[in-house]
Amino acid sequence: IDMDKEALAPALGKLVSGLYIISLKHKDQEAGFLASWVQQAGFEPPMVSIAFNKERKAHFDLLTGGGKLVVNIMGKENGKTMSRFFKPAPETGSIFDELDTFTGITGVPILKDSVGYLEAEYFTEMETGDHLIVLAKVLGGALNSTEIEPSVHLRPDGFKY
């Protein structure tokens, strides 16, 4: 089947997503990245799916090594915090060092200024072309603010972030 990518791109970009910082920790190594393709994927047990770009192999390896993660739900006011994750990670220390964080049941950094968070553990993954889809079991979570609205993300071109 021939696909008309030019016609498909704007329609695909209208699939609504949010903006999230995924926190990872294994032993003393911490990492985080900005994600937009996160979705609830089950009620009992509660599950979430997260798309990992294959170029982020180091993050994926850290997750499968440690098994724990936090989905920080970012809000419209969190631009400064999110901008920290647009840059490469520092060569020493943690990407979270200059941010206000706390830890919950998983020991993975949680951003205090996020709308809320989900603590989860790796369950399985599936390869899907240029991304890996991780399914994670949610272990806990809470809102940090009832005042901040979650970010809603639409893309003009469904073939680009």
Predicted features by range, described:
Residues 1-161:
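Basic, polyanion-binding surface patches
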